[in-house]
Amino acid sequence: MEHQGVRKTYRYRLDPTPEQAQVLEIVIWRCRTLYNVALEQRKLWWERGQDDGASYYQQKAELPGLKAACPEFGAIHAHVLQDVMLRLDRAFQAFFRRVNAGETPGYPRFQGRGRYNSFTFPEYGNGAVLDGRVLSLSKIGRIHIRLHRPLEGRPRPLPSAGKRMGGRCVSLARRRRCNHFLAPDKKPG
């Protein structure tokens, strides 16, 4: 039997400088703003009956134009902005899945300060790299991290930075091999 990996996520506290903390807040604020603007755009498309343009790929394709029109979004890594669009698309997919299942759907919500408090680098190594006790985030800088337990396995996507319990933290996903599996002694039932 081939060994399969197990995905495990580790959460660590960040120790940013005051300037880095301010940059992290600005990135989260801009990501939340982009999410809300994209949600408003989809809502307008839907009300006008132009639902053919309301897709992740359409909105993702508009990001370069947004960065040209609003240079402050150019200060954020492109994959982080694309992940914001993916978050919104997943919210709509869940909405339509519930509609089709006959459940109470719950239209995707506009995100306030307390509801949208993180951002994600979808690819490890492309914008986010851990080097010892320092996390390098593209266009943000090198932030010290409190490694209170060792990381196991090889890096996987989704280094996610945000705020939890009043402090800033990062979640790092890792894939590690399992050297043992429990096999059942007898057939279930």
What are these regions (language model features)?
Residues M1-G189:
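Nucleic-acid substrate recognition interfaces
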